[in-house]
Swiss-Prot record:
It comes from Xenopus tropicalis (Western clawed frog). The keyword Ribosomal protein does not apply. Belongs to the CTC1 family. One of its GO terms (biological process) is telomere maintenance via telomere lengthening. This is CST complex subunit STN1. Keywords: Chromosome, DNA-binding, Nucleus, Telomere. Component of the CST complex proposed to act as a specialized replication factor promoting DNA replication under conditions of replication stress or natural replication barriers such as the telomere duplex. The CST complex binds single-stranded DNA with high affinity in a sequence-independent manner, while isolated subunits bind DNA with low affinity by themselves. Initially the CST complex has been proposed to protect telomeres from DNA degradation. However, the CST complex has been shown to be involved in several aspects of telomere replication. The gene is stn1.
Length: 368
């Protein structure tokens, strides 16, 4: 585990760490103990490395079958974690039932047969028993305060001579020693110059905006703020200290005092615009001066969930679920056009992370 004192890396810099977009091969014990990000739900940290997806190999120790998925307990000898593995949907037949036999070509019939056979084989491989070896790659989720893996890929490992498991035993210590246990270091030119650097250090305006937006995120998260005015943020000393730092490309005007106050307002405004673009906050049409914090707006989450539940009962959406753009249109009809795609993506990710909804395919969602 990373030390408790290790400061969380700003989310805008996570992409600099190659582990972020990779499937991290971690011990299950470490996955269960990862510290969750305060900035973005569903992201975890190991020694400063942002972890989104993991790759585990272990023995199936329990099996629970539901209508749409299997839940496998996977044990790698360091711990046990539940893995949600979705069942494949039945293939749609190439030839429609109402088509007369003389109009159906032999190649179409053959394709129907092949698709059915492939589906049967895939269904067989998805069903594992206790004692089988399984490999799972997927995202870490938290459901009912229990950490689990929602699989994007999973399969039974045929390893009678234990070659694959032995290779894994040698591979993981090497990865830990040379990659995971080496803390992620932010490049010097991107570090917060307020930590250990002199006050007269000049930064660019774009860097200051990015830095302030990250600090605002942390401030909103730690204080569980639901909504705010810009002027309220401008009264927070820790945020003012960042926004008032000297900027190399900010145009000076008549006096230093007026220049500094104008810079602070401008930096705050741009930082808020960045948060709006990311979907971290949004505005309701009724009051454009108030900013709503997306993660704290329970009404928006409830509205989105109800839209998906209600529409998935209709025949049109019963099979595949609701498309993202359809959900967005319905939400905008209720809340207003100010709800951006980025805001809804954040809400959808939270609902999916809580297992309130599931993705049936790319950009399609359904609710239980």
């Amino acid at each position: 585990m990373q030390p408790a004192s290790l400061e969380e890396t700003p989310s805008l810099l996570w992409g600099l760490d190659p582990i972020f977009l990779a499937f991290a091969k971690l011990y299950i014990k470490d996955i269960l103990e990862l510290k969750e990000s305060q900035q973005v739900p569903g992201i975890f940290f190991y020694r400063g490395h942002p972890i989104k997806q993991v790759d585990v190999l272990g023995t199936v120790v329990f099996v629970r079958e539901k209508e749409n998925f299997y839940s496998y307990g996977v044990d790698d000898s360091t711990g046990v974690i539940s893995c949600t593995c979705w069942k494949s949907t039945a293939p749609t037949e190439v030839s429609s039932p109402g088509t007369s036999a003389r109009h159906v070509s032999s190649s179409s019939k053959d394709l129907d047969v092949m698709m059915r056979e492939l589906y049967k084989e895939e269904s067989k491989k998805a069903k594992l028993d206790i004692g089988d070896t399984i490999r799972v790659r997927g995202s870490i989720k938290v459901f009912r305060d229990q950490r689990e893996i929602v699989a994007s890929v999973f399969y039974k490992v045929e390893d009678p001579k234990l070659d694959i498991q032995m290779a894994r035993m040698f591979d993981l210590p090497y990865m830990y020693r040379n990659v995971y246990d080496k803390p992620f270091a932010i490049p010097e030119h991107l570090k917060d110059s307020s930590a250990g650097q002199t006050d007269h250090h000049i930064v660019t305006q774009s860097h200051l905006i990015m830095l302030l937006s990250e600090k605002v995120k942390v401030f909103l998260m730690e204080n569980k703020i639901h909504n705010f005015y810009q002027r309220e943020l401008e009264s927070v000393d820790s945020l003012i200290a960042i926004a008032s730092r000297p900027v190399s490309d900010f145009k000076t005007i008549e006096s230093m005092e007026s220049s500094n106050s104008k810079q602070i307002r401008s930096i705050f405004k741009e930082a808020i615009q960045l948060l709006l673009k990311e979907g971290y906050i949004f505005q309701k049409d009724q009051n454009r001066e108030v900013y709503q914090v997306t993660d704290q707006d329970k009404d928006l989450h409830k509205l989105t969930l109800n839209i998906i539940k209600e529409d998935c009962r209709r025949q049109k959406h019963a099979e595949k679920g609701c498309h993202f753009l359809h959900i967005l249109t319905c939400v905008r009809l209720s809340v207003g056009s100010s709800v951006s795609e980025a805001v809804l993506r954040r809400v959808i990710d939270t609902l999916e992370g809580n297992s309130d909804i599931v993705s049936t395919m790319e950009n399609y969602y359904t609710a239980f």
